[in-house]
């Protein structure tokens, strides 16, 4: 009952802030306010838009919205998303560029599974597409996975990464962003010991908590209490 009351309180705060943001956006973007020289209304509309978006629930997975990429020939080439490895808790997908020869450089982006979809790395994918074959871990929302599929913990997460790296082979460059950095390191170390032929060519860790004590934060301080 205590946890339910806490959840209800947080949900009430979320919906209230979402409503405040929507109200501010509606009032600030009203056509009549645009006639006034005071920038307050534009600022209120911008604040309202950001606030409403921040406190809204992500009900539907955002689309990648990567339709074309400019090739070396200066032309637009169609980008298709194809599934390479399909698993209950996440897939390995590939951004296939039509009309272009496969690039020699192969990059695996390990996206975070921390309340965001892999589309959070959309801009990173777009920046890599002209120069590399881009793959990414497309994690599923846990609420959409039936209990019959079993558990998914740190060991399972690491096993998924090992499987994805094996599927792509030794010539892959792995880039782990934020939360999966330690697990990508563990998966790479596992392959280095047990299957060197599948070990990635390089491993880049961006913003990951490899050594939390290296730069103490409020979170690490709280963990020591």
Where are the predicted features?
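N-terminal cap/leader regions of alpha/beta-hydrolase-fold enzymes
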Residues: 1-225
């Amino acid at each position: 009952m205590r946890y339910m009351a806490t959840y209800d309180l947080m949900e009430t705060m979320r919906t209230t802030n979402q409503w405040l943001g929507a109200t501010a956006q509606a009032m600030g973007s009203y056509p009549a306010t645009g006639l006034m020289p005071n920038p307050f209304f534009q600022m209120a509309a911008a604040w309202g838009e950001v606030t409403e978006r921040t406190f809204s629930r992500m009900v539907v997975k955002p689309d990648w919205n990567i339709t074309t990429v400019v090739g070396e020939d200066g032309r637009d080439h169609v980008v298709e998303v194809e599934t390479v490895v399909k698993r209950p808790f996440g897939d390995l997908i590939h951004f296939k560029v039509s009309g272009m020869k496969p690039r020699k450089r192969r990059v695996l982006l390990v996206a975070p599974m921390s309340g965001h979809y892999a589309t959070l790395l959309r801009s990173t994918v777009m920046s890599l597409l002209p120069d590399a074959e881009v793959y990414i871990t497309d994690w599923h929302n846990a609420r959409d996975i039936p209990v019959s599929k079993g558990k998914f913990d740190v060991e399972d997460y690491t096993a998924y990464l090992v499987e994805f790296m094996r599927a792509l082979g030794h010539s892959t460059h792995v880039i782990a962003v934020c939360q999966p950095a330690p697990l990508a390191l563990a998966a790479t170390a596992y392959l280095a010991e047990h299957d060197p032929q599948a070990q990635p060519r390089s491993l880049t860790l961006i913003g990951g908590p490899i050594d939390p004590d290296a730069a103490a934060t409020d979170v690490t301080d709280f963990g020591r209490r």
